[in-house]
Amino acid sequence: IRCFITPDITSKDCPNGHVCYTKTWCDGFCSIRGERVDLDGCAATCPTVTGVDIQCCSTDNCNPFPTRKRP
């Protein structure tokens, strides 16, 4: 599987059986810039973090930088 990874937003190979994931959350600039986004690549299982929205997927390059409206 290939997953996008920030900061370069490049696609990299991940080990077999891993999932791609994207993290979004609000920081101190959320009201100005919108949610912060990290394309963290891949993990063996979908991680969970309190206060962070994590979306996981399991196909090549399925975690592109999300499009969203600016505040």
Curated annotation (Swiss-Prot):
Q: Which UniProt keywords apply?
A: Acetylcholine receptor inhibiting toxin, Disulfide bond, Ion channel impairing toxin, Neurotoxin, Postsynaptic neurotoxin, Secreted, Toxin
Q: What is its main location?
A: secreted
What Gene3D superfamilies does the entry give? CD59 (2.10.60.10)
Q: Where in the cell is it found?
A: Secreted
Name the Pfam families on file: Toxin_cobra-type
List the GO terms this entry assigns under cellular component, sorted alphabetically: extracellular region
Q: Known CDD domains for this protein?
A: TFP_snake_toxin
Tissue-wise expression: Expressed by the venom gland.
* Intrachain S-S bonds: 3-20, 14-42, 26-30, 46-56, 57-62
Taxonomic superkingdom: Eukaryota
In alphabetical order, the GO MF annotations are: acetylcholine receptor inhibitor activity; ion channel regulator activity; toxin activity
Something else known: Constitutes approximately 3% of the whole venom protein content.
**What is this protein's function per UniProt?**
Nicotinic acetylcholine receptor antagonist. Binds to muscle nicotinic acetylcholine receptor (nAChR) and inhibits acetylcholine from binding to the receptor, thereby impairing neuromuscular transmission. Produces peripheral paralysis by blocking neuromuscular transmission at the postsynaptic site. Induces concentration-dependent inhibition of indirect twitches and abolishes contractile responses of tissues to exogenous acetylcholine and carbachol, in the chick biventer cervicis nerve-muscle preparation at 100-300 nM (in vitro).
Indicate the family of this protein: Belongs to the three-finger toxin family. Long-chain subfamily. Type II alpha-neurotoxin sub-subfamily.
Q: What is this protein called?
A: Alpha-elapitoxin-Nn3a
Q: Which organism is it from?
A: Naja naja
